[in-house]
């Protein structure tokens, strides 16, 4: 009997450089993609290396050039005080706490908390399409708007309407970004002044409590402490340059692991802008969630793996760290 396996040709090992001299990956048909960004094609990156299995291929990263970017896991999006039911965002929170955050800490991977945190000037400059996404206020046609710029501020006779202009089905405490959310009741019966919607340093824009405690501890670390960066659009990397991009460039960070809410909005918007700006993009598929239909999550996972970069899980991220090479 002929052993057919012995007659099959062996695939040769292939290697490649992808990119340009200033920003490139290496690829090996045996070991996958190397995203460690050595200074030149003839050199190797010094220091620790982590290999992580993604949905399609292994990737190897440099912890010192990587960041875990956790987006918008704030009270407004997750707290039951705003009527948020337990869902995909809360499940993602659990995966981050159990796997991704401890792994990032162990590896010395920087954790960036990228959150809505508007100033009064941001609200004034915000275009209508972005404002509409969070609802707005409307007044009776028999009423008059306040003259000048004040017309864009809240009016005593106004009501809250959703992004389609339909009055809210139940009384809403806020009427769009920058408006007061009123007093809310927490699960334990405590009342809290929620502050102005998505503006910096308000209760509604604070991190969801389980994560807030983690950030507070991480911000005190002597080496690679956690950082909190405000954003003023769905994407934290939109336009010419944002505070997030300035930080990434200052720290020499090139590889970004994305998590948070909502996958198909702020997480996805930041990821696609990062892709266009030349960053290495990895979506932690169970470290992010959305209130949109399942197809929205699936589309971002599909495109992250096939076009924008790579897709993996929080557990695979942690497994890679456990097997980290020095």
Per-range role (PLM):
Residues 85-89, 129-130, 275-276:
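Glycine-rich, phosphate-binding/catalytic loops in enzymes
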Residues 120-123:
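Short catalytic/ligand-binding loop motif for oxyanion handling, primarily in non-cytosolic enzymes
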Residues 125-137:
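Charged, often glycine-rich, active-site loop that binds/positions anionic groups
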């Amino acid at each position: 009997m002929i052993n057919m396996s012995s007659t099959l040709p062996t695939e040769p090992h292939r290697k490649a450089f992808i990119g340009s001299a200033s920003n490139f990956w290496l690829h090996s048909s045996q070991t996958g993609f190397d995203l460690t960004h050595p200074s030149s094609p003839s050199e190797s990156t010094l220091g620790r290396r982590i290999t992580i299995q993604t949905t399609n291929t292994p990737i190897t990263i440099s912890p010192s050039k990587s960041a875990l970017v956790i987006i918008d896991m704030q009270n407004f999006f997750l707290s039951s005080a705003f009527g948020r039911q337990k869902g995909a965002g809360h499940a993602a929170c659990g995966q981050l706490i159990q796997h991704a955050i401890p792994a990032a800490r162990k590896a010395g991977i920087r954790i960036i908390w990228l959150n809505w945190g508007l100033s009064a000037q941001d609200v004034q400059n915000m275009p209508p399409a972005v404002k509409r996404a969070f609802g707005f206020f409307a007044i009776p046609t028999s009423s008059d708007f306040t003259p000048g710029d004040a017309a864009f501020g809240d009016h005593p006779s106004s009501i809250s309407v959703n992004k389609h202009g339909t009055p809210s089905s139940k009384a809403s405490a806020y009427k769009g970004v920058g408006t007061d959310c009123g007093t809310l009741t927490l699960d334990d019966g405590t009342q809290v002044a929620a502050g102005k919607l998505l503006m910096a340093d308000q209760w509604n824009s604070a991190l969801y409590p389980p994560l807030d405690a983690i950030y507070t501890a991480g911000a005190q670390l002597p080496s690679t402490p956690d950082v909190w960066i405000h954003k003023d659009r769905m994407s934290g990397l939109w336009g010419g340059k944002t505070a997030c991009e300035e930080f990434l460039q200052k720290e020499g960070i090139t590889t970004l692991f994305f998590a948070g809410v909502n996958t198909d909005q702020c997480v996805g918007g930041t990821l696609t802008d990062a892709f266009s700006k030349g960053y290495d993009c990895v979506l932690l598929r169970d470290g992010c969630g959305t209130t949109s239909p399942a197809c929205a999550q699936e589309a971002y996972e599909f495109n992250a793996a096939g076009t924008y970069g790579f897709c993996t899980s929080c557990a695979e991220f942690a497994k890679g760290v456990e097997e980290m090479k020095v």
